[in-house]
From Swiss-Prot:
UniProt-recorded name of the protein: 33 kDa chaperonin
Keyword Manganese: no
Record localization: Cytoplasm
InterPro entries for the chain: Heat_shock_Hsp33 (IPR000397), Heat_shock_Hsp33_C (IPR016154), Heat_shock_Hsp33_N (IPR016153), Hsp33_helix_hairpin_bin_dom_sf (IPR023212)
Top-level taxon: Bacteria
Name of the gene this protein is made from: hslO
GO CC annotations on file: cytoplasm
Modification comment: Under oxidizing conditions two disulfide bonds are formed involving the reactive cysteines. Under reducing conditions zinc is bound to the reactive cysteines and the protein is inactive.
Organism: Vibrio parahaemolyticus serotype O3:K6 (strain RIMD 2210633)
Length: 291
């Protein structure tokens, strides 16, 4: 089947749009960077699905970050995605977390932050409390309050054919459409019947036909979704020289090198004293170049 793909579709006679995302490798890359507890893996999968679905609603080049913050065992869980559906994510937690821990058991008292950053134009940030039993309900509340467009989400994570999968669907009323509330309710009822194994295992066209074969559905060209971190040795070197020089050389004197670790992909970049000196020489306008 086609996985790591987002499909957009339109109910031509009902003034409702939809999205379907099916992920395996992109999800697996994110949860393999650390030894995340099972419940945190699930939460990251839900955030990943949510971010890809919301990013697909962008009508411009830019990115969306969906972030959970709280005072519970999980202090942070965040996924970032852009208009090219390049995604990355990370979570921070302390202590033991039960496999079946709920959103509120993990996050405690917290909130959801959605940040939209166009390449051109103003940055937008929305903050909502964790009102709801799960992430799906929190996001639907966000849509109700901010977009004021009737929106429903279905988000699933789990094992399929021995590997972690994450998938989801979104349906949303088209502004100024000619459809009736009954149309949306009709599609809600149909989508409520979707099973995990269908989301994880069926091709998009087969799944959409299974759900909506009585309706006229136009499916657009699929868009691939891929893990992309964006870290590099060059960026790590640039970060080092923003730190007080004396502090960096104290570290070098103590351990012989300076290392930066990327939380998103798990890569560690290590610089010895010669390389650090070259970084500072380059930054001060010297002729030496770091390779």
């Amino acid at each position: 089947m086609a996985n790591n793909v987002l499909n957009r579709y339109l109910f031509e006679d009902l003034s409702v749009r939809g999205e379907l995302v099916q992920l395996d490798e992109a999800y697996q890359r994110i949860i393999s960077s650390k030894e995340y507890p099972a419940a945190v893996q699930k939460l990251l999968g839900e955030l990943l699905v949510s971010t890809t679905l919301l990013t697909a609603t962008l009508k411009f080049e830019g990115s969306i970050t969906i972030q959970l913050q709280g005072d519970g065992p999980v202090s942070l869980a965040v996924i970032n995605g852009d208009h090219n559906q390049q995604v990355r994510g990370v979570a921070r937690w302390e202590g033991d977390i039960a496999d079946d821990a709920s959103l509120h058991e993990m996050m405690g008292k917290g909130y959801l932050v959605i940040t939209i950053e166009p390449k051109k134009g103003e940055r937008y940030q929305g903050v909502v409390g964790l009102e709801g039993e799960n992430l799906t309900e929190v996001l639907e509340g966000y849509f109700a309050n901010s977009e004021q467009l009737k929106t429903r989400l279905w988000i699933r994570t789990g094992e399929f054919e021995g590997k972690p999968h994450a998938a989801g669907m979104l349906i949303q009323v088209i502004p100024d459409g000619t459809g009736s509330p009954d149309d949306f309710e009709h599609l809600e009822q149909l989508t409520n019947t979707v099973k995990d194994e269908e989301l994880f295992g069926l091709e998009a066209n087969d799944l959409l036909y299974r759900l909506y074969n009585q309706d006229k559905v136009r499916v657009y060209e699929p868009q691939p979704v891929a893990f992309h971190c964006g870290c590099s040795r060059e960026r790590s070197g640039a970060a080092i020289i923003t730190v007080e020089k004396a502090e960096i050389y104290d570290i070098l004197a103590e351990v012989g090198s300076v290392s930066l670790h990327c939380d998103y992909c798990g890569t560690t970049y290590t610089f010895d004293e010669t390389e650090v000196t070259e970084l500072y020489t380059q930054a001060s306008g010297g002729n030496k170049t770091l390779h």
